[in-house]
Amino acid sequence: MQMVEINSKNVDSITREGKTYLYFTAGFSPFAAAMEQVYQKFLMEAEQYDVKVCRINVTDDIALGERFHVKDLPTMLVFRDGMRVHTTEGIVLPEHYTNLLKFY
C-alpha cells in the first residue's frame, strides 16, 4: 500500500494506473468520525495489497469533493486504471471496505 498526497491538480495522474482508493472525509462530520476506526482497519488491511490510498478532507479541498460529486461523508471512491469502478457513501460495516480490496 502506498499513502499518496492528492489534490485537484494531481488526481488524474495518481488514479491513472493501478488501484486507487479516495477516501473523502471532514472533521465536522459525525458520520466520518464514527467511521474512523473502520478506515484505520482498512489501512491495515490495505498494507497487504498493491494499492494507493488517498485521504481527502473536503474542507481543505472543496474542488476535489465537488469534482466527484461527494454528497455524503465519508465517501470511498475506487479507481482502477483511471476508471471509477465503485462508490461507497456513509456508514458501512468494516467488512465492506475489506471486500473492496479483494474485489477491486
Placement of each model-derived feature along the sequence:
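Short acidic active-site motifs
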Residues: 9-11, 60-64, 96
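Mid-chain, well-packed structural core segment of small domains
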Residues: 58-75, 80
